[in-house]
């Protein structure tokens, strides 16, 4: 009887411990999940802001940027795959306390992303018209999209670095810096877009080129 009572007390204690652990886990997971959701939302809004604000320029400009961003989306998918793989490896070795390996993994990923960025940059900067002809046969849309794509291609050189680096930071539990970075990037993008579209602060009205330039500035600040 005494052994049974002792075993029952141990079971109750273990169950309470598991419940506490579950609560702690859910609390910790929520503190990580919400900022990451916010970061992804803001990162998407940076691209959406271009399209929405181009609606104030013309429907042609808005259509051109949307089609040009299809090319950018391909690059973003490559970044996303690399960032996901890098973050998994970084989290694994960070948990082991092997910071040197984490640095090597991050360095290798950044070098690969730079090579990919350079390839996409060269193609979009030298052949923007050929890229736009894949998505449309409208001369006006091709002209506006080519202008937009040629300028925004400079953002590729910075976007890969930030995407992989911030994904790696999230994987080791450092979520504040990526959150602040994305918020600053969104604010800079909207401010620059408005300035170049409406000619604020004495700046020239650059239309579709101005929106692309605003995105480049936002990516540099990011």
Language-model-derived ranges and their functions:
Residues 36, 44, 70-73, 108, ...:
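Residue-level recognition of pore/gate-forming positions within transmembrane alpha-helices
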Residues 1-14:
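Single conserved hydrophobic/aromatic residue that forms the stacking wall/gate
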Residues 31, 54-73, 139-144, 208-210:
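Interfacial/gating helices of multi-pass transporter permease domains
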Residues 41, 45-63, 132-139, 195-206:
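Helix-terminus/linker motif at the lipid-water interface of multi-pass membrane proteins
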Residues 22, 26-45, 49, 71-78, ...:
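Residue-level signal for short hydrophobic patches within transmembrane helices
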Residues 187-221:
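Membrane-interface helix-loop junctions in multi-pass transport and translocation proteins
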């Amino acid at each position: 009887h005494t052994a049974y009572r002792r075993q029952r007390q141990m079971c109750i204690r273990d169950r309470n411990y598991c419940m506490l652990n579950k609560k702690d886990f859910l609390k910790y997971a929520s503190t990580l999940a919400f900022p990451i959701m916010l970061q992804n939302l803001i990162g998407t809004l940076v691209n959406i802001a271009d399209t929405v604000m181009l609606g104030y320029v013309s429907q042609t400009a808005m259509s051109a940027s949307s089609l040009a961003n299809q090319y950018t989306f391909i690059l973003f998918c490559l970044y996303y795959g690399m960032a996901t793989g890098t973050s998994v490896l970084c989290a694994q070795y960070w948990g082991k306390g092997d910071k040197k390996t984490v640095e090597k993994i991050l360095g290798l990923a950044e070098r690969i992303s730079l090579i990919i960025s350079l390839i996409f940059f060269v193609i979009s900067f030298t052949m923007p018209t050929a890229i736009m002809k894949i998505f449309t046969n409208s001369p006006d849309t091709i002209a506006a999209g080519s202008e937009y794509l040629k300028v925004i291609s400079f953002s590729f050189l910075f976007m890969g670095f930030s995407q992989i680096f911030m994904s790696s930071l999230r994987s080791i539990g450092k979520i504040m810096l990526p959150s602040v970075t994305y918020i600053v990037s969104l604010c800079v993008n909207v401010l620059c877009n408005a300035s170049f579209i409406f000619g604020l602060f004495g700046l020239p009205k650059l239309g579709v080129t101005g929106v692309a330039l605003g995105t480049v500035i936002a990516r540099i600040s990011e």
